[in-house]
Structures are given as C-alpha cells and as structure tokens.
C-alpha cells in the first residue's frame, strides 16, 4: 500500500512539475516596422528582427512599411536581400508594403518590386493607421 501511494505521489509530482516548467506561449502581438533607409545594415536589421519576432511566437503579425529610400529593400536590382525577403514572406506572418507616393517620386514601377510585395497608397498613413489600431511601432535605423 505504501508503495502504491509513493508511486501515485511521484506521478503527481512529475505531472505538476512538468506543467509548471512549461512556459505558456505569449499572447500574439502586432508590430509595424517603419523603414525609410537604403542602408544595408538597416535592411538586414529588419530581416533579423522579423525572424526574432516570429521566433517568439509564430502567430505574431508583422508589417514592414517602406517609404522614402526604404523601398530599395524590395526593388529588384537594388536589393541584396531578395531571397531573405522571399523567405520571410513565405515562412512568417509578415507583409512588405511600399508607399505608392514614394514609388511615383522614385519612378519605380510595380514590375520592379519583388514578388508578393504590396503597395499602399501612403506609407506614413499606413504606419499611423497601424498605430491607431494598437500595433507596436519600431523605427528601423541607427
């Protein structure tokens, strides 16, 4: 009888310890990255941050909004990170959105954008809308 009680106690202790040691998945969050820099260091940083945010919780939602010279990250022939952008789009909850005004000002055609990059009417307006909707804000730059 003592043996049965000891075994039962040990089983309960193991179950409680295992449940206690499991850390709950953090609640998903939404973050908008504001990219206006053509600097490759900044572009690499945003790719790294996307992967880190995704690693915390795969349900986290992200958006990179590019305007000004930030468009270089997703323009064929100007970016050295095309495969990293494609991988991020394919394997994380991230959208890459470019500003239509910046495209017009820089004479960039939609055909020059990497696949699956989306166009928004106004980059600044997009960032503000995300902030108003409760998204976290990260300015990409150094």
How would you name each of these model-derived features?
Residues 8-16:
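Bacterial N-terminal signal peptides
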Residues 19-142:
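Secreted/extracellular ectodomain signature
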Residues 1-8:
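Bacterial N-terminal signal peptides that target proteins for export
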């Amino acid at each position: 009888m003592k043996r049965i009680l000891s075994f039962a106690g040990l089983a309960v202790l193991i179950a409680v310890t295992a449940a206690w040691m499991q850390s709950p998945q953090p609640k998903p969050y939404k973050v908008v990255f504001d990219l206006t820099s053509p600097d490759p260091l900044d572009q690499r940083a945003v790719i790294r941050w996307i992967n880190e945010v995704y690693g915390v919780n795969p349900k986290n939602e992200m958006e990179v909004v590019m305007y000004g010279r930030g468009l270089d990250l997703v323009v064929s022939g100007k970016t050295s990170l095309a495969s990293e952008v494609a991988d991020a789009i394919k394997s994380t909850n991230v959208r890459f959105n470019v500003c239509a005004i910046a495209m017009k000002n820089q004479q960039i055609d939609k055909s020059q954008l990497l696949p699956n990059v989306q166009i928004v009417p106004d980059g600044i307006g997009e960032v503000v809308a995300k902030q108003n909707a409760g998204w976290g804000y990260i300015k990409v730059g150094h």
